[in-house]
């Protein structure tokens, strides 16, 4: 143990043993975390009536003193939770947390407000505020830990759940159709295409009387099926579903500006169906696990599908050649 360490040890011990007054300036408040408050300073913002306490919170918020706003608003909620002033206090808590960029905590406080005080006059505004918060997370904002202070990760799953809460809070509110679409967008961004399709389907069905929303839902529904089809080379069902979805979109919204793009997508998907069937036919023909008869039968089925889908495709000639080569082998299989 060197002399420097011994010296530091005695300094720390000396300071620790000094008598001093500790008015416990560090205080923890649920939702706020730890904050510093010198002894006696709370007299500046505490009041004995809910109305007066809320006025302190309002004035502090107006002056961008969010720390005092939170203290005063939380006091209203703690001391007078059933008063007429509690909903506004809860609202101010959410607003302060937003201003401090603690969006996840703000969202939760707004959620608590809607559950505890469902008749609040700010209901629609709060839904829109929740929507804007969710949009920020959709745009890549990080979720935080340690009472909302440390940004750590992005999550489209948690973002989609936020949009889901907004829809559940008011399924037929003005913001709900947009939030429902965003559930699909978040799931799509997360490459959870099955969940995305379901979300878009819900939007198109529930808000069918809102043409802008319904059209957007149907179009994005078709796009999501198309994305699935590119990842399912041996399952041409997704391409067929995408074609059907685009066709429905064109039928229901023939004047939509995206019809031309939908028609082009259908053409591409049909070409992809042909290519996919050809790939599956080759898979059967070259399989090492199937019997010779199974390989030839399977290959012929899918080569025929290539011709049925488009007899003039770039794959058609080769498909015909392979059918002509395989059929005689089925009738007269070579001796094993």
Model-predicted segments: where are they?
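Bacterial N-terminal signal peptides
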Residues: 8-17
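Bacterial N-terminal signal peptides that target proteins for export
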Residues: 1-9
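Acidic, polar-rich low-complexity tracts and alpha-helical solenoid repeat scaffolds
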Residues: 20-336
């Amino acid at each position: 143990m060197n002399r420097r360490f011994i010296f530091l040890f005695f300094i720390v011990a000396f300071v620790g043993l000094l008598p001093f007054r500790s008015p416990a300036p560090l205080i923890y408040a649920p939702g706020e975390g730890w904050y510093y408050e010198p002894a006696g300073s709370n007299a500046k913002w505490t009041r004995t009536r809910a109305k007066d306490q809320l006025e302190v919170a309002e004035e502090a918020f107006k002056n961008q003193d969010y720390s005092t706003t939170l203290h005063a608003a939380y006091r209203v909620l703690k001391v007078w939770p059933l008063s007429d002033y509690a909903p506004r206090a809860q609202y101010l808590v959410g607003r302060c947390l937003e201003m401090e960029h603690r969006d996840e905590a703000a969202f939760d406080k707004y959620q608590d407000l809607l559950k505890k005080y469902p008749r609040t006059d700010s209901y629609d505004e709060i839904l829109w505020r929740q929507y804007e918060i969710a949009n920020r997370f959709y745009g890549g904002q990080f979720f935080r830990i340690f009472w909302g202070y440390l940004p750590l990760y992005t999550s489209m799953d948690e973002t989609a759940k936020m949009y889901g809460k907004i829809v559940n809070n008011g399924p037929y509110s003005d913001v709900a159709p947009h939030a429902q679409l965003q559930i699909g967008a978040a799931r799509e961004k997360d490459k959870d295409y099955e969940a995305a399709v379901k979300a878009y389907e819900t939007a198109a069905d529930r808000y069918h009387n809102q043409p802008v929303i319904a059209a957007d839902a149907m179009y994005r529904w078709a796009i999501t099926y198309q994305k699935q089809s590119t990842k399912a080379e041996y399952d041409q069902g997704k391409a067929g579903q995408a074609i059907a979805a685009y066709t429905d979109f064109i039928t229901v919204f023939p004047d939509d500006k995206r019809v031309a793009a939908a028609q082009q997508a259908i053409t591409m998907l049909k070409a992809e169906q042909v290519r996919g069937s050809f790939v599956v036919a080759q898979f059967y023909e070259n399989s090492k696990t199937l019997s010779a008869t199974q390989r030839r039968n399977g290959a012929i089925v899918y080569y025929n599908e290539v011709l049925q889908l488009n007899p003039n495709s770039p794959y058609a000639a080769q498909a015909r050649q392979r059918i002509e080569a395989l059929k005689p082998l089925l009738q007269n299989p070579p001796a094993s």
